[in-house]
């Protein structure tokens, strides 16, 4: 007989999520899952700017569930005042099979079309490509997310409009999805750099999964030799501005710099930060609360 779990769901103010998650891990002895988090790991503080989120904890149903629920309700009541004081809905309990717990998250990941011809699909999902489609396979069970966050989509859409760049540099490569897309779109040479060695490992696995060759390094940006037809940077606005000089220096004459990871409220800050870069702002795209800027080296 399949093992069952008692799934306890708590809908709480977003600010209470981390505190509640820690409490539930200690209470249950198991991990928790959090709905309403971005499906890509690109976030500012780890959680989207949403009013509420759902935290799910998993208990052995043979334990005293009434006692566990009472402790959770007491915890929520004690902490509600610190987060606006509005009543927090009572936790709900659902019995689920072990298999459902292990694989149920997969229902959220489906093939996603980005731009005209780029498609991101989970490894387990069948997909019939249309003529000209460039399919990128990812396993979202790995670190660094699914690649469908708005910041990534905006970058991919901008990249697709630039045709077939010869040399591409992906700064802060993460999952490697932008680098993989550059190869798929015809780039001859692609370098992906990230200060996180774990990101480079994951990016390498994703490149192998897609059968593409990308040079993956942890080399600091300023030490990477040469200039590139396209430079991609999907990182926080503050880091973009801090690196403005080094990023601009890597763009070849006639080449482009694509900047993403920018909250729209920080767009002006980034534009000002690149005001002395010597590059011309040629395009701006937005999705929800995110902006993407495209610069060109007119030299």
Curated annotation (Swiss-Prot):
CDD domains in the record: AdoMet_MTases
Keyword NAD: no
Sample GO molecular function, one term: protein methyltransferase activity
Location in or out of the cell: Cytoplasm
Keyword Methyltransferase applies: yes
InterPro entries per UniProt: Ribosomal_L11_MeTrfase_PrmA, Ribosomal_PrmA_MeTrfase, SAM-dependent_MTases_sf
UniProt keyword terms in alphabetical order: Cytoplasm, Methyltransferase, S-adenosyl-L-methionine, Transferase
Catalytic activities: L-lysyl-[protein] + 3 S-adenosyl-L-methionine = N(6),N(6),N(6)-trimethyl-L-lysyl-[protein] + 3 S-adenosyl-L-homocysteine + 3 H(+)
Residues noted as binding S-adenosyl-L-methionine in the record, renumbered to the chain: 152, 172, 194, 234
GO BP of this protein: methylation
Pfam families associated with the record: PrmA
EC number assigned by the record: 2.1.1.-
Any one cellular-component term (Gene Ontology): cytoplasm
Reported function: Methylates ribosomal protein L11.
Family in the record: Belongs to the methyltransferase superfamily. PrmA family.
Protein name per its UniProtKB record: Ribosomal protein L11 methyltransferase
């Amino acid at each position: 007989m399949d093992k069952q779990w008692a799934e306890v769901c708590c809908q709480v103010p977003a600010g209470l999520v981390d505190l509640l998650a820690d409490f539930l891990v200690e209470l249950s002895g198991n991990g928790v899952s959090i709905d309403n988090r971005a499906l890509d790991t690109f976030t500012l503080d780890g959680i989207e700017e949403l009013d509420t989120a759902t935290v799910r904890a998993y208990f052995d149903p043979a334990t005293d569930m009434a006692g566990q629920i009472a402790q959770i309700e007491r915890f929520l009541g004690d902490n509600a005042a610190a987060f606006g004081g509005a009543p927090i809905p009572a936790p709900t309990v659902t019995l689920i099979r072990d298999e459902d717990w292990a694989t149920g998250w997969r229902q959220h990941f489906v093939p996603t079309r980005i731009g005209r011809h780029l498609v991101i699909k989970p490894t387990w999902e069948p997909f019939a490509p249309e003529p000209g489609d460039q399919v990128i396979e990812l396993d979202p069970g790995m670190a660094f997310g699914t690649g469908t966050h708005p910041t990534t989509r905006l970058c991919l859409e901008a990249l697709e409009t630039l045709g077939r760049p010869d040399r591409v540099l992906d700064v802060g490569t993460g999952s490697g999805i932008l680098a993989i897309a550059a190869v798929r779109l015809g780039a001859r040479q692609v370098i992906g750099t990230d200060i996180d060695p774990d990101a480079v490992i994951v990016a390498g696995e994703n490149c192998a999964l897609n059968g593409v060759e990308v040079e993956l390094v942890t080399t600091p940006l300023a030490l990477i030799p040469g200039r590139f037809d396209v430079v991609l940077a999907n990182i926080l606005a503050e880091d973009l501005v801090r690196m403005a000089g080094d990023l601009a220096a890597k763009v070849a004459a006639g080449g482009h710099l694509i900047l993403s990871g920018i909250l729209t409220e920080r767009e002006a800050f980034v534009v000002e930060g690149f005001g002395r870069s010597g590059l011309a702002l040629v395009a701006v795209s937005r999705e929800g609360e995110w902006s993407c800027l495209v610069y060109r080296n007119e030299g």
